[in-house]
Amino acid sequence: MADWRPLMVRRDDGFPRIMGVLNITPDSFYADSRLSSIEETLKIATTMVENGADWLDVGGESTRPGAKAVDSDEEIKRILPIISALRNKFPDVGISIDTRRAIVAEAALDEGADMVNDISALSDPKMVELIKTRDCPICIMHMRGLPENMQHNPEYGDVVSEVKKILSQKVNILISAGVKPERIIGDPGIGFGKLLEHNIKLLSAGKKIIPLEKMGLMWGVSRKSMFSDLLGRKKTEDRLAGSLGIAAMAKSRAVDIIRVHDVAEHRDLFRAMSTLEDF
């Protein structure tokens, strides 16, 4: 396993760690990110690592709006050989497993994954005990509803305070079980049961949604449908500029990890911004 501790917080220059997305699914919302073989995944992952990825996030179930769930056996079948191959090739790179199921997370951790990226924020009651026992980090994300129905007219009074309240409840469950705050990272869940106005408010709030000082903040905005509403970009392949525009805010919002499809472009952005700050 990698030494994930320094990878949970921002870089020394204040910019976030970069997490590259590896979708081992046939139906993820961004077609170019769909991977189906170990060889293809290793090729893409190698490019990501060479371009500066700190983390590789492996998912075997699509969570795009309207996506149907797959069973745990199929999810494990998809991700296990990939994680094994990634761990062998990249011993020092952080590997996270994107799953809602404790049984899948456990199998991934056994194979060498370092962190659990749980978009359902502990919907599986066995997840808490797993995280406590393994003493591994976890990302908990806010989502209103399920992927198949989350975008059906989501409503909030004050989206920032409501998201923080839910995350606080989940964090308290973990803390009560003995999980250390620095093992926990929160994600506002951009595009998961939110309209454009909700997404913008949450991005603007930055780390204000995080209930504990020692916790981290992760953003996942890469090529999401909010750029269709914001910029009129209906095709996912046309949303890179919008993704980079949001990423440029990450340092000022104290983001620790940013989850992206386009590692090289985000690393170049942060390098350019860091260089300009020195003048």
Region locations from a protein language model:
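Short glycine-rich or small-residue beta-strand-to-loop segments that form or flank ligand, phosphate
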Residues: 189-191
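Phosphate/pyrophosphate-binding loops at sites that engage ATP/ADP/AMP, CoA/4′-phosphopantetheine
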Residues: 49-50, 54, 89, 170-183
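Enzymes and membrane/adaptor proteins characterized by extended Gly/Ser/Thr/Asp/Glu-rich
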Residues: 26-28
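Active-site-adjacent loop and "lid" segments of alpha/beta metabolic enzymes
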Residues: 1-6, 13, 30-44, 63-88, ...
